[in-house]
Structures are given as structure tokens and as C-alpha cells.
């Protein structure tokens, strides 16, 4: 059983370093040589994929913010390349992200969804303000926040309910087209 499997099965709080060491065929002393504690081991598993997720999102947001300099009219498939990259990353690291969403209580990642919501809220508020300036409207921050959670919830549902990457991609593309077309709803005219 791998470290990820132990953490996924038991969750961060209940994952035993002794069990992880026994399954890996090493002593706890050997583990502590490489990792200060369970948090460091968990970080070694999750930090890379999580940080790459943030980098993918930030890169996409930079592109979207540049688009918002001009009036933007959403078209079907506008975000397909981004969605494909994002879904592929999530599914290349499926066990890690499933663990972060369902078994991270007690770890530094227990608030990962809220942290992502904060990043999305900040970015979407800026983009909505730019979009609103083209329509002569004002951003409805509460609607931006709701939309942020709709998007996050769609991806959380995807990871927690669909193990097949191709099926997940087909469904989430439709969801993203729906959400992208609804962005004008966050502007009060």
C-alpha cells in the first residue's frame, strides 16, 4: 500500500506513520530521516500537484484578464484548451486531489477548497469589474462569490464522482460552457 493509499483510505488524521512505514518496508527512524513528521510526508505527496494546479489557474487567469481589456462575448469552447489542461492535471494526480478533497482534515490542506475559493473570488471580481466597465454596469460581488462556488463545486463533484478522465472532461466542458456564458449575470446594469 502506498503512502497515498494509506492517507486516502484513513485520512490525514488517522493515517499512521507506523502503518506507512510497515507497508513501505522501512523503519519509522528511516522515515524521520527524510521527513520531520506526518505533515512533511503529506506535503511531499501533495505540494507538487497542488502548487502546479495553482500555477495552471494563475496562467489561465492572466490570459483571461488580457481578454477582458476588450468587450468579451463568450463562445462555446472558448475555454476548452484550459479545461483539458486542468482536467488532465487533476486526473494525472487523481489520488492526490481526491485525498485533498476528502481526507485532508487536520493537515495544512484542510482548507484547500476555501483557499482556492479566495483565489478565484479575487480574480473573478477583477475580471468582472473589467467586464462591467464595458457594459456600464457594476459588479455584484455576491453573485461573483456564488459563481466561484458553482465552478469549484463542479470540479469537486467531478473528482469525487467520476474516475474516468475522458468522461469527466466531456461533462465538465459542458458545465464550463454553461458557466462561461452566464458571466454577464454578475454585472448589475
What are these model-derived regions, one by one?
Residues 43-49, 112:
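Alpha-helical DNA-contacting segments of helix-turn-helix folds
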Residues 2, 6-40, 44:
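Helix-turn-helix
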Residues 98-102, 127-179, 187-188:
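Hydrophobic/aromatic-rich alpha-helical bundle segments in the mid-to-C-terminal region
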Residues 44, 58-89:
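Hydrophobic alpha-helical connector segments
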Residues 17, 47-54, 59-61:
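Short, basic, alpha-helical segments at the C-terminal edge of helix-turn-helix-like DNA-binding modules
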Residues 4, 100-117, 170-183:
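C-terminal/domain-terminus segments
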Residues 67-73, 100-107, 136:
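Short linear capping/connector segments at secondary-structure termini
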Residues 85-92, 106-132, 142-149:
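Amphipathic alpha-helical packing segments from all-alpha helical-bundle domains
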Amino acid at each position: 500500500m502506498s503512502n497515498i493509499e494509506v492517507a486516502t483510505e484513513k485520512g490525514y488524521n488517522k493515517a499512521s506513520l507506523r502503518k506507512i512505514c510497515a507497508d513501505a518496508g522501512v523503519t519509522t527512524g528511516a522515515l524521520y530521516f527524510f521527513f520531520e513528521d506526518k505533515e512533511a510526508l503529506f506535503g511531499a505527496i501533495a505540494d507538487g500537484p497542488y502548487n502546479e494546479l495553482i500555477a495552471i489557474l494563475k496562467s489561465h487567469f492572466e490570459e483571461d484578464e488580457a481578454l477582458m481589456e476588450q468587450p468579451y462575448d463568450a463562445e462555446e469552447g472558448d475555454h476548452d484548451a484550459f479545461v483539458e489542461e486542468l482536467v488532465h492535471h487533476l486526473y494525472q494526480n487523481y489520488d492526490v486531489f481526491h485525498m485533498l478533497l476528502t481526507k485532508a482534515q487536520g493537515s495544512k490542506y484542510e482548507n484547500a477548497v476555501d483557499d482556492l475559493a479566495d483565489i478565484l473570488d479575487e480574480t473573478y471580481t477583477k475580471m468582472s469589474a473589467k467586464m462591467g466597465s464595458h457594459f456600464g454596469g457594476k459588479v455584484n460581488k455576491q453573485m461573483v462569490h456564488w459563481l466561484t462556488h458553482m465552478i469549484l463545486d463542479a470540479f469537486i463533484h467531478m473528482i469525487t464522482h467520476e474516475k474516468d478522465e475522458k468522461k469527466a472532461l466531456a461533462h465538465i466542458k459542458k458545465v464550463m460552457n454553461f458557466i462561461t456564458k452566464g458571466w454577464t449575470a454578475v454585472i448589475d446594469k
